[in-house]
């Protein structure tokens, strides 16, 4: 795919950008393959040697990524996959800050432009103020009907292949909230304000047993908190501080999806920055010099451990 390849035009009334994002990024193997591709893997044998993956699973995922324009026919990265760097950088920063076992082993990031070790800051491109989950207003866009956003793949039991993918991941907690279609859809719904079990089930069409498992996982890792107003009322599931901190991951993933998968009736989700009142275009900036980041200017001390190209 050439660098100036246009975005994919989605079918009217079909899956929207969120649905396409969940289908591509809401899959542990896809994330791991893309991670390795951005770190230099470009041959089938390299993916096989770096990941505990079977030939059949690798062949299927590579075919999907080629068909979706994230890899070329010879497994080189494309503009579409290279533009995922803000998502990966946001994942890295969230795990560094919020997952205790990572705090002393993740390598530092250096901003080549200013030469300083830095942390990425999500900010509003219009007013340049830092933004987090509490400063954002998430609203359903013209193409944002849940029937078009929810995962299209049928659910299935977790297989040994999926367990191997999770064990291979450098960021297991992120995989728990993004590396599965239903989990990623649940995260989107939570940011849109959904909090009741029945509302999650109705909006997403997720089987009750799967929803129960995902909600429990989100609570176990501290992304959601479950509260009940009274003994007769069912729990409400709300984003914790750790959950709201996933705004950077979600926003960069949504912006990537809505850049590359365009519905004729408009975006699936519209974000507004409460601070300035403008529609949000998020960007990552260096917390040391304040300049906007670009992928080519981010250096890491140990690229293999970082998972960032």
Question: Across the structure, where does each feature detected by a protein language model lie?
Answer:
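Conserved catalytic core of two-component sensor histidine kinases
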Residues: 59, 212
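Alpha-helical linker/hinge and terminal dimerization helices associated
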Residues: 68, 93-99, 221, 256-260
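C-terminal regulatory/oligomerization modules of transcriptional regulators
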Residues: 96-163, 262-309
